[in-house]
Amino acid sequence: MTERKNGPAPAPGLIARLRRLVRPAEIPVPETRAAGPLGRALMAWSPPQGARWTARRYATLADEGYVRNVVVHRAVALVSRSVAAIPWIARDGEGREVSVPAFDALMARPNPRDEGTAFREALAAQLLIAGNAYVEAVGPPGRPRELHLLRPDRVTVQAGPGGVPTGYEHREGEQVRLIPVDPLSGRSAILHLKTFHPLDDWHGLSSLEAAAQAIDQHNAAGAWNKALLDNAARPSGALVYQPKDGPAALADDQFERLKAEIAEQFEGARNAGRPLLLDGGLDWKPLSLSPADMDWIAGRNAAAREIALAFGVPPQLVGVPDAQTYANYAEARLALYEDTVVPLAQAIARAFARAYGPGFGIAGLEPDLDEVPALEPRRAERWAKVAAAQDLTRNERRAALGYGPLPEEN
């Protein structure tokens, strides 16, 4: 017998079981597994048979992406929280900034459960994860008292003629209700916000769905890393059956029983370092990983960059190593706001203005970009340009900076 590893004593009785398993069968078995070039191996590498991708369903994507993938979770949280943190400015029909206490109160507390910032964060997150967000208004038409977010996978759009849905079906457990849509005005108690989808007239395409393959690759690389850690960062090897006499290969039942014994006694982190004692006819062939097999880290980082790209987030903001596309963190945050956060915040504000603005006497809603610290470099550039323009009047300068005119000025 030969000791192949150092560590604690072998499990009692294993050698006897191995002897019984490798003893030639008394009754020949008609079907046996053919011996390979090295004899009978309990482990073998095979080429990939085909990739398996996560199903494109909301619950599956949300679980595999937002719940289980740290890059997706960080990207969604970063964008949605940034969108929710920007306050809104209400304007009347002439473009003047106005304050409407009833609307301000609704936005500050849309419903008894949620405050305004958390509500807008969840809404933005649903758009990123599902490509759709459904807001139900409770109260008088056009002037709601409460706003509630409905889970996207529980709402079904009832298709109608002319691109206008006939209603929205909301299913929660056994309860099903239909929220109708006015066929003439298109108004409904449901405000449906959706992103562009080239293949669907009624639903949006989420960033999460676009990143699904990169998410699967990132998760698979993480699982591969975990499997290596569980097996001492290398495949243990192959146990080869090479008898001096008797059948050249184990029978099927002998093979399966021996494989089960090895798995129970030696596989996994809990058995790391356990010695393997071999009887006659058995030989241990240690295996190693090639540099390409070990290069899962590069593949995982590449997948993380693709995920960040799908969500419009600079990779360095989600912790991807060696992804310093921007000179510093401030420039990366500026790009995040200009390319992703501000456009999404503007789209949400415009949708709310169309749905609820008329009932409160509001002509338009827009994010107050002066309250965003990350955009300070752009504000400084604009102020410097306006100040340097000597041919502008005082009110023209104020208009260029987003302020209303002074009454005493022409």
Predicted segments with their positions:
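Alpha-helix C-terminal capping segments
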Residues: I89-G93, F352, Y356, A389
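Structured, contiguous alpha/beta core segments that scaffold functional sites
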Residues: T2-W296, A302, E306, V313, ...
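Surface-exposed loop-to-helix/strand elements on domain peripheries
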Residues: A233-D252, R274-A384
